[in-house]
Amino acid sequence: YAAHRASRALAASSSSPPPPPTRSNGTHDFAPTTILISLDGFRADFLHRGLTPALTAFARAGVSPKYMMPSFPSLTFPNHFTLVTGKYPSEHGIVGNNFWDPVRRKQFTYTNASLSNVPEYWNAEPLWETAELQGVRAAIHMWPGSEAHIGRVEPAYVDRFDGREELSNKVHRILGWLDLPGPADPGASNETPRPQLIAVYVPNVDSDGHKYGPNSTHVRSTIAEVDGMLASLLRGIEERNLTDVVNVVVVSDHGMATTSTTRLIQLEDIVDLQEIEHVDGWPLYGLRPFNQSENRLLELYDGLKKQEELHEGNFKVYLRDRDMPVRYHFTNNPRIAPLWIVPEAGWAIAPKSEFDVAAGLRTGKTFAPLGLHGYDNDHPLMRAIFLARGPAFPHPEGSAVEPFYNTAVYGIVCQSLGITPQPNNGTIELPFKTIGTHDPEEYQQPPDDPPIKTAGPSNPLPSTMTTISGEDAATRAGDDKHAAAPENTEPGEEASKGSGDENTTWRQWVDGKLESFRHWVTGIFGDHK
């Protein structure tokens, strides 16, 4: 945190590159302006289902890769902070939706504002602070972390999370900001400035993906509704003659995998929970044993590796400081637990108190959520989107670029605004190096769901593999889903107020599933978790 403060001071004193030129829509002058929209849980292949005419037309007029890769773990809060800092979760500090900080001896829980909207957790300068420190006013609509009061300056506008908000209201909010008078216009005011950076969070696809599954009819409808929202926004921008004046960047944070009761592992069957003090994450598990000596960690690791083999590789086991894949960039931070269980995409792990796998298979009980993420960030089912159009992207229409990681988004948006970014892990410079053009309507085979596992006389599944299709996932989804609904400081705050609060809380957002998850955690690991 102290390093973050120092880096901000350095950035404030450094010189910025000349900003892009002011542009006019015929009646008003606009300084460089960029709208960044995040569609939580919008998997890359959702663009190829014939449900998104607005996004397809937008891609055809702009520039995009076939997909963008999220950062590990592919969860909402870590990735939304990566999108606005350009740093890996291990560097910016938000290493999961839920995690234990052994230095502060406190728990980060994105569903509780008092446990998440603490500036000390957020160890990097977000996009809105970078902008404000360089005189570019920012408006942030429900973006995860935007209510945490990070740094020494606040955005000009911050909208608290409201899970009941209609998509049309998001459009009205964005266009309302664009309609404010600019600095040279009559009626201009420092109290109500026209923002140049607008960042907007849209949780709908992720929320319904968890609840109904990414391949469900309901999610198809939700994808179409979100596309309709973007159609209304783009139409409003065109009506204001701002299509060639304002940059629009549409991204997502991760994809989604379908869960199945045949792809569930009972947590107690692979590890002795009496030895574990804290459990972080989900659907991946970070384990903090009471005894974290090197010898005991190796013993637990060896035992879990045997279980990994027994379960035919349906999950992987890693020691943070020994064999965590380098490409995960998931080491060198005490908030990252020392021992990890990472399921294969579509698999979930559940404690028996939350879902009895054997009983679920016997009775046909369905596990919820029906969709999950948080897996290997390079898995095709976790792929996200990036689409951009505007004066900062002067490429031929329909330009294609090579797929890239979401650490690049922060720097791209900074360049579009003409501001100097903080040091980050992105490497892309504008204009993009394009690789020709592509037709966004060209059909792409969607990634396959994981195969359904069935037990047979010749290859019986271990009892722990009986799966809770999405239920465990569901509660987590609630957890991660909340991710879908940003950990917003406001969500946390509202969660603490109870169901009578005027705004929908994150817990309400996940239909009460988080509450059951909280009881499970408390029951097993105590109130500190």
What are these regions (language model features)?
Residues 3-8, 86-213:
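His/Asp/Glu-rich, glycine-adjacent segments
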Residues 45-92:
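Short, structured active-site-proximal loop/turn typified by the sulfatase FGly-forming signature C/S-X-P-X-R
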Residues 66-84, 141-149, 426-433:
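Short, solvent-exposed turn/loop segments enriched in Gly/Ser/Thr/Pro and often Arg
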Residues 165-172, 182-185, 205-246, 413:
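A long, amphipathic alpha-helix that forms part
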Residues 245, 252-291, 449:
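Acidic/histidine-rich catalytic neighborhood
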Residues 280-412:
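Active-site neighborhoods of enzymes that stabilize oxyanions during catalysis
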Residues 312-336, 420-452:
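Polar, surface-exposed loop/tail segments
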Residues 339, 454-529:
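Phosphate/adenylate-binding glycine loop and adjacent helical scaffold
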